[in-house]
Amino acid sequence: MGCKTSKMCCPQLRKKKRQKAHQGGLTSQELNDLNAKTQGPNEVLQKIKEYEQEIRDLLQKHQEEKTALADAHKADVEARTLELQAQAQKDRDAETAKLLSEQAATMKAEMEEKFAELQKSFEQEKVSLTQTHQQFTDALQETVDELNSQLASFREKMKRVEESVLRQDYRRHIQDHGSPGQFWEQELQSLHFVIEMKSELIREQDKRLRNHESTMERNLVLEERSRTLQQENEALKVQTQKQGAVTVRLSEELLSTQVSLEKQIHRCEQLQREKEQNLYRAVNGDAPQQFSLQSNAQELPVMVL
C-alpha cells in the first residue's frame, strides 16, 4: 500500500516541483537532482517539511517587511499630519491676528473720527460761549455807559429843575401875591424836585425792566442750548459705551468661533486618521495569518513574484 501510494503521489510531487522550479527560476540540473532525491516517501515528506519551513520563513519575512513598511508609512503620515496641523494652526493664527488687527484699525479710525467730531463740537461750543461772554460783557459795558449817561443826565436835570417853568411860575406868583412863607416855599420846592426825580426814576426803571426782560430771554435761550448740548454729549457717551460693548461681544464671538473651528478641524483630522487606519486594516489586516499548507501553496507564486 505504501508503495502504491508513493507511486501515486510521486507524479504529483514531481509536477509541483517542476512548477516551483520553473516559477522560482531553478535550473534543469537542480531539477534533476531534486527528482533524484525525492524517490522515496520519507525523502518526499522531509522535502515537504523543508518547503513548508521555507514557506513559513518567506511568509514571516514578508510579514516583517509589511509591518516595517506599515510603521514607516504610519510615521510618515503622522509626521505629515503634524506638519499640516502646525501649518494650519500657523495660518489660523495669522488670519486671526490679521482680522483682529483690521478690527482694531477700524475701531481706532471710528474712535478718532468720533473724537474729531467731539473736538469740533467742543471748539464750536467754545467759540459760541466766547461770543456769548463777549456779548454779555459788551451788554454790561453798555449798561454801565448808559447808567453813567443817566447819572450825567440826572445831574443835568437837577440843574434844570432849578430853572424849570414851574419854578419860574412860582417866582412870578410870589412877586404877584407875595411870599407864602419860607417853610411853604421850601416844601413846594422839595415837592417839585421829588416829582421830577420820581418821573425820571420811573422812566429809568421801565428801561431797565425792558433790558432785564431781554437779558432773561437770552439767558433762557442759552440755558436751552446748554441742555441740548449736554443731552447730545450724554447720547454720544451712551453710544460709545454701546459700541465698546458690541466690540467686546464681537471679540468674544470671534474667539468662540475660532475655538469651535479648531475643535471641528481636530475632529476632522481625527476622523481622517481613523479612516486611514480603517482603510489600512481593511487592506492589510490586523490578525496574524494561520499557516495552512494548501492556502500557502496557492499564495506562494504570488509572493515569489
From Swiss-Prot:
GO biological process: spindle midzone assembly
Subcellular location: Cytoplasm, Cytoskeleton, Spindle; Midbody
Biased composition (Polar residues): 25-38
GO molecular function, one term: microtubule binding
Alphabetically ordered keywords of this record: Coiled coil, Cytoplasm, Cytoskeleton, Lipoprotein, Myristate
Main location (coarse class): cytoplasm
Coiled coil feature spans: 42-281
TM helices/strands, residue ranges: none
Region (Disordered): 13-38
InterPro entries for the chain: MTUS1/CCDC69
Record lipid sites (N-myristoyl glycine): G2
Family: Belongs to the CCDC69 family.
The protein, known as: Coiled-coil domain-containing protein 69-A
Origin species: Xenopus laevis (African clawed frog)
Taxonomic lineage: Eukaryota, Metazoa, Chordata, Craniata, Vertebrata
